[in-house]
Regions:
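Extended, charged low-complexity segments
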Residues: 283-327
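Eukaryote-biased recognition of electropositive, low-complexity segments
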Residues: 180-302
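Extracytoplasmic/secreted cell-surface and envelope-processing proteins
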Residues: 59-63, 97-102, 152-162, 195-200, ...
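Von Willebrand factor
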Residues: 41-148, 152-153, 184-187, 191
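Well-ordered, non-membrane alpha-helical segments in soluble/globular domains
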Residues: 65-76, 113-132, 157-177
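Acidic, polar low-complexity linker/tail segments
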Residues: 3-50, 55-63
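A charged, solvent-exposed segment within the mature domains of Sec-exported extracytoplasmic proteins
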Residues: 134-207
Length: 327
């Protein structure tokens, strides 16, 4: 018999494998036929890195002595900088303020005093405007890194404001996706030492010797982000991360199978190792290895039993998906 098995992977796209099952006496031979999707080649494009740190009043307290934020930004941007052809540094609030020095000087100048001198409206932050500004300056060969506590300046009509803000930011990203359908977005949640005023709308409170969350947004072509993640893993950010989520458009999954013909065991099953490159989906390894994320169009015949990392160097694939085929 000749069947086609469609194995949708919910975090990516689909893999289609044709299965031919032939009876050979008491045993059966199963032959798999597939069209390999090649793994992406190493990127040779010229990539422009743009780094934006929000210089608002709510960010001042992160710039205290012993700030984890400054160390993380310095280390992470230094690593990304090696993978790009240029790096531009900015402050951002109501306007974009270019920084003319190098990365070392930029980090040293992450202080409340420098924030105030840089200009713009440091009192109120409109994230809708910030994302609109960043995305409109984000060409197809640009990767933007935005560092912020992402606190909204909420007016009295909070419910109406939050709904409007959510829709506005969604529309901004949808417009960017229309221009660049391969746009990917990563949001990394971290914590830093915090000493100063915490703002919420018109209220504020002085906090001392506490840790507060902040976020790094990485925005750019998902192929670029996938290569960044391979060479500069998000999980290795100094101090560890507190959370991670990402968006990438559906795509073909690069995959191959080591052999095509199998003889079934006594239970009538075969075990197939599927070599796949899942990096382009930008998801965390916890999601990659969660078999609940994988769906078979014919679960009576094909089951995903496990997903394992490929740790060997020089391999273009990221994971091995183990499939059980029933004859």
């Amino acid at each position: 018999m000749n069947k086609k098995l469609i194995i949708p992977i919910t975090i990516c796209a689909i893999i289609i494998i044709a299965v031919i099952s032939t009876c050979l006496g008491k045993s059966s031979k199963i032959k798999l036929i597939w069209e390999t999707v090649p793994a992406p080649k190493e990127i040779k494009d010229s990539i422009e890195l743009k780094v934006y740190v929000e210089n608002s009043g709510s960010m001042d307290a992160y710039m205290c002595a012993g700030s984890n934020l400054k160390d993380v930004v310095f280390d992470y941007v230094s690593d990304l900088k090696r993978l790009t052809t240029s790096c531009s540094l900015y402050y951002i609030n109501s306007e974009v303020i270019p920084f003319t020095g190098n990365l070392n000087t930029y980090i040293k100048n992450l202080t409340p005093q420098s924030y105030a001198k840089a200009g713009g409206n440091c009192t109120n932050t409109d994230l809708r405007q910030i994302f609109d500004t960043i995305l409109k300056a984000n060409s197809k060969q640009t990767v933007s890194v935005f560092i912020s506590d992402c606190i909204l300046d909420i007016p009295q009509n909070a419910i109406d404001f939050l709904g409007n803000c959510q829709i506005s930011i969604k529309n901004t990203f949808n417009e960017a996706l229309a221009v660049n359908p391969e746009l990917g977005v990563e949001i990394i949640k971290l914590e830093s030492k915090f000493k100063g005023f915490w703002f919420c709308g018109h209220n504020r409170e002085f906090l001392d010797d506490v840790k507060r969350p902040y976020y790094i947004w990485v925005i750019g072509n998902q192929r670029y982000l996938a290569e960044f993640n391979q060479k500069v893993p998000v999980e290795n950010i100094i101090g560890g991360i507190k959370g991670y989520c990402a968006y990438a458009t559906p795509q073909k999954i690069p995959f191959d199978i080591s052999k095509s013909t199998y003889v079934t065991n006594r239970s009538g099953k075969i075990h197939v190792e599927l070599l796949v490159n899942l990096r382009g989906s930008l998801q965390s390894n916890n999601i990659y290895k969660n078999i609940a994320q994988y769906k078979s169009a014919n679960p009576q015949q094909v089951v995903v039993t496990s997903v394992e990392d490929i740790t060997a160097t020089g391999i273009t694939y990221s994971h091995i998906i183990i499939l059980d085929f029933s004859n």
